């Protein structure tokens, strides 16, 4: 949460930089909910150990936790409007607050502080809910209208800041983390079977669902209005759409990217403490650090994680980039024993099953960074907006095939994978591509490619009655497409642009940004993502696909923009990211640890499984017959949630 809200005495200053979590409860009765909200605040103290703010009145209370990056008097929330009608708490950063403040001041508003909290509230008083579409930043906002007894919640357009809510007979509650909801007295929780299936399909629960049937995430770019005696009203204030710009020469696109990128990074580096960066040595993180060194007047601190296995170790690439850019660089190595020891703690940070393989190294690099800085920049979002994944290149190839060949490829994709582990990693990727080739559009192929398990594997390990509750498996892709994109005419004709819209709707808020938020907040570290700044998103949604994908090479414009800043060849290599060597680890001690979790956590006793089939996957993987590491990793994390995180129903 930002609260550059010090006394406004006419002195210009960058202001207080704070981050936090917010929580609240609108009770059905007229009791005092402050004690319950204080307990919620205590459960997210890691998001802000320095300060607590609470507001309460009969039937309603909300609170926040704050980490002060510079503690200036007046940064404390809640923030009240001059007439005392509105009370605000929010979590985030508003980068264009100065411009909005000037506009409001020109209209006659007199400000009492120097910060963005008051600007949001003043904007809401003047423009109503329209203010949220004017904010450039990352935020989760809660505004209580004392006169109308109305609560308004809003979340930033791409979902950088989280916000969960639950509407139950005991009341309406919200929180920055799911675990804070589960502590409320009188609230009851059951596991959503569709969320369970989602998890084993995608490796995370699809937004807006959570693992609990009674809780939801507020979708990015949405407002939720809650009034007593009425159903909560959900409205979208921003929807991603491609708005192609007039044709420009390639070199002008590169210059536009470079200029926008430098401005965005400079904007997100404003702080009264040192700002660091995650550096994997790949294109996006290198672009972040290269820009930071150009807009900062002091050395940049960079951080990376290495692995003993050279096939997965990027630390030497990161160190080469750091040396070229002159950063103060820190590398730590994460081995099998360390990862296994960390996994229970990391899994608990999410309060629901979450199985991105890079969650452990991301958690670890956040811990390393938090030892030296309070703010770090990350390159997340670059692959999604500028076509950096393998799926973008393969989609171009598949999309160029005549329809009969695509349907033939889909039939080939049904052939079982080869029984050799080293070949199997590549074969499985191409099998997913082939299996999706005959699907009718880019959105459908995106959902097929994003899955971490095949329909065949799910039929093998899950009980038929569990799978049946989701309907005919042959129609699952069509159902997903209809859920996220009911208006197909709003989609771009370019399938890669459809991929980007899918990432903005599903993968970024549900997986990538969730991973980074929980990993960093566990260590009271603020992570900012300049690739997902408003101007960068607008640029990406206006840029032609040809500037992003050059044949089979993604992020063309990013490569060309940063080429003058780094020695040639530093980032022309195979993409890795902070990934763990799962296949090899599950063949040894890590696999035995996961199998122990499966047998002892209670998950095996659920009626959703074909238990002997799951037992067989462990044996097949150990024997090198099949690579089941993605499913087994998801299962291990699920077992940890089952045993340790899940609240009592």
Predicted segments with their positions:
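Adenosyl-5′-phosphate
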Residues: 15-19, 183, 192, 213-220, ...
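Membrane-proximal basic amphipathic "stem/tether" segments
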Residues: 397-450, 636
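Cysteine-centered catalytic environments shared across enzyme families
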Residues: 16-350, 362, 366, 564, ...
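Active-site adenylate/phosphate-handling loop in enzymes that bind or generate adenylated species
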Residues: 157, 364-423, 507, 512, ...
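Ala/Thr-enriched low-complexity intrinsically disordered regions
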Residues: 2, 11-14
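Glycine-rich loop motifs involved in handling phospho/adenylate chemistry
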Residues: 275-284, 309-310, 357-360, 385, ...
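Short low-complexity, flexible loop/linker segments enriched in glycine and/or proline
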Residues: 344-348, 370, 392-394, 585-587
């Amino acid at each position: 949460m930002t609260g550059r809200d010090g006394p406004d005495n006419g002195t210009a200053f960058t202001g207080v930089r704070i981050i936090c979590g917010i929580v609240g409860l609108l009770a059905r009765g007229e009791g005092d909910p402050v004690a319950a909200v204080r307990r919620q605040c205590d459960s997210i103290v890691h998001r802000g150990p320095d300060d607590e703010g609470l507001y309460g009145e009969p039937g309603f209370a909300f609170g926040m936790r704050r980490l002060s990056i510079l503690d200036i008097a007046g940064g404390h929330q809640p923030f009240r409007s001059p007439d005392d009608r509105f009370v605000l708490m929010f979590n985030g950063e508003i980068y264009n607050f100065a411009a909005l403040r000037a506009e409001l001041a020109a209209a006659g508003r007199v400000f009492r502080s120097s910060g963005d909290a008051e600007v949001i509230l003043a904007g809401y008083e003047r423009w109503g809910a329209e203010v949220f579409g004017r904010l450039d930043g990352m935020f989760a906002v809660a505004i209580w209208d004392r006169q109308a007894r109305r609560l308004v919640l809003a979340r930033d357009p791409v979902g950088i800041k989280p916000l969960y809510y639950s509407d139950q007979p005991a009341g309406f509650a919200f929180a920055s983390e799911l675990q804070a909801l589960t502590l409320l007295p009188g609230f009851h929780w059951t596991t959503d079977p569709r969320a369970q299936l989602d998890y084993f399909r995608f490796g995370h629960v699809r937004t807006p669902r959570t693992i609990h049937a009674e809780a939801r995430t507020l979708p990015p770019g949405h407002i939720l209005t809650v009034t007593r005696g009425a159903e909560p009203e959900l409205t979208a204030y921003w929807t991603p759409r491609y708005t192609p710009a007039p044709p420009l020469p390639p070199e002008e696109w590169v210059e536009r990217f470079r200029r926008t990128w430098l401005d965005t990074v400079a904007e997100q580096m404003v702080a009264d403490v040192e700002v660091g960066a995650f550096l994997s040595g790949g294109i996006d993180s290198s672009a972040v650090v290269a820009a930071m060194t150009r807009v900062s007047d002091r050395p940049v601190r960079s951080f990376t994680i290495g692995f003993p296995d050279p096939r997965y170790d990027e630390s030497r690439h990161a160190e080469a980039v750091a040396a070229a850019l002159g950063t103060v660089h820190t590398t730590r190595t994460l081995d099998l024993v360390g990862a296994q020891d960390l996994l229970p703690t990391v899994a608990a940070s999410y309060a629901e099953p979450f199985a991105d393989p890079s969650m452990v190294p991301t958690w670890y690099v956040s811990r390393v960074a938090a030892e030296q800085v309070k703010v770090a920049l990350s390159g997340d979002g670059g692959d999604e907006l500028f076509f950096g994944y393998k799926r973008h290149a393969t989609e171009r190839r598949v999309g160029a095939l005549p329809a009969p060949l695509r349907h033939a490829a889909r039939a080939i994709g049904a052939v079982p994978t080869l029984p050799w582990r080293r070949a199997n990693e590549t074969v499985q990727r191409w099998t997913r591509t082939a299996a999706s080739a005959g699907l009718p559009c880019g959105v459908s192929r995106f959902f097929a490619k994003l899955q971490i398990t095949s329909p065949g594997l799910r039929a093998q390990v899950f009980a038929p009655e569990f799978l049946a509750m989701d309907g005919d498996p042959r129609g699952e892709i069509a159902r997903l497409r209809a859920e996220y994109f009911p208006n197909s005419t709003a989609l771009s004709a370019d399938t890669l642009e459809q991929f980007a819209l899918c990432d903005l709707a599903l993968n970024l808020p549900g997986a990538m940004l969730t991973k980074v938020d929980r990993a960093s907040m566990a260590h009271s570290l603020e992570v900012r993502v300049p690739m997902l700044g408003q101007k960068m998103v607008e640029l990406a949604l206006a840029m032609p696909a040809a500037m992003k994908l050059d044949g089979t090479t993604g992020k063309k414009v990013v490569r060309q923009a940063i080429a003058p800043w780094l020695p040639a060849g530093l980032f022309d290599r195979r993409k890795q990211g902070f990934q763990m060597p799962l296949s090899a680890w599950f063949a040894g001690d890590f696999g035995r640890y996961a199998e122990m979790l499966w047998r002892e956590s209670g998950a095996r006793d659920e009626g959703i499984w074909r238990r002997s089939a799951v037992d067989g996957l462990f044996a097949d993987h150990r024997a090198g017959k099949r690579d089941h590491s993605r499913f087994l990793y998801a299962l291990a994390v699920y077992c940890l949630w089952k045993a340790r995180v899940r609240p009592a129903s």
